[in-house]
Amino acid sequence: MTVALMWEARAVDGRGEQLLAWAREQDLAQEPLRRETFRAPGDRVLVITWWDTAYDAELPELPEPDGELVRRSVHRWRFESVTAG
């Protein structure tokens, strides 16, 4: 099964590039199948990692950035792939 972990944070105004750089620098304890980093208006950064594992498996996640860098807590979601029926 493929599991996708999504990590999304919103930077303090004007610090989106710093948050993006911070997210890119973070190493995970295990290497995912795939990792992509995105940015969006409003100084938001999204990181998605894909894993070949069970939905409830323990997986490494990006930590919370320094409170001076973000305006709110990180949002995290876990999804599993489904096949078209």
Question: Where are the predicted features?
Answer:
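Short glycine-/aliphatic-rich beta-strand segments at the starts of folded cytosolic domains
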Residues: T2-A11
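Hydrophobic pocket/interface hotspot
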Residues: W7, L19, A23, R35, ...
